[in-house]
Amino acid sequence: MTNKNFYNALKAEKERLMNESKQASRDCQIKHGEMSKAWNIINALESLDKFGTQELSNAYDNYEEASHASMLADNYLDDIDEAIDKINELMSLYTD
């Protein structure tokens, strides 16, 4: 593979990752919203003195699940951004 072909392959992969990053960012926003909603339900149940109920227990389980999903979405977005940074570093070798 020639240097020009390699550079073009890097450029194409960067473009693909940039599009993936946009979707991952939207997914993060959705997951953060789900986590916030789950926490608001917990607050509402606690304000109604629903302590020790199955309903509150389920709400905490839902929050834990939403929190985990949010963390995974954040990690995925971070991984994409890191890959883009590495591609930018490689591409800079060809422009210097």
Locate the predicted segments by residue:
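Short, charge/polar-rich alpha-helical segments
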Residues: 1-33, 69
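Intrinsic-disorder-associated interaction segments
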Residues: 3, 34, 76-80
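Glycine-centered signal
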Residues: 9-10, 42, 82-85
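Extended alpha-helical coiled-coil "stalk/arm" regions
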Residues: 27-59
